[in-house]
Amino acid sequence: MQQLLTGKIRLVETAVKTKATSANVHFRRSVLAAEIADRLCEEPTFGHVKMEKMLFLTERLCHIDIGSHYHRDAAGPYDNRALRSIDSQLKKQKWFEVRRTEKGNRYVPMQNRGKHKAYFDKYYSAVLPTFDKIIDTFKTQNTERCEIVATLYSAWEDLLHSNKPFTDADIVNEVLNNWHESKKRISKERWLSAIQWMRENGFAPNV
């Protein structure tokens, strides 16, 4: 009986710990998004889609877990549930509010803008150089450019996980034929050029 009680207590403790850890991941994800918004909200190119791509690239290149589950969307790797959660948390904390405009959704600063920074420094100081590089590189880039890099990164990473040999042409084929029809609006040459740029600038996946 004592063993059963002990086991039960352990189960309860584990459940509580798991719940707390999950909540912490969601908060850390919102803190990261707040820093991205803080740095990019004045840029005319920054909105919902670019936020998603910056989160994806940061998660992958900084090797951090923010509880995202991406799927292949028209605009690249996308996690709609996570983005809705982030938008809700940003507004709850009064850091940023998403407003729909003629040019799409914009992140508008609220009265507590900047108060996330203590948390950001706590959670992400170890990856700050890589994070800074991502933000500085894509700060003024248009949404399509961010979409191209994020999409290639995801397709490239998937091929690496397959443990089979592949070429740059295979990466592009994965994007053009196994992703979304809208990807075909971008020329094969442009995809190949972007792969080379990613290698030269340190944005290639390394699994």
Regions found by a protein language model. Name each.
Residues 1-24:
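Amphipathic alpha-helical coiled-coil/heptad-repeat segments
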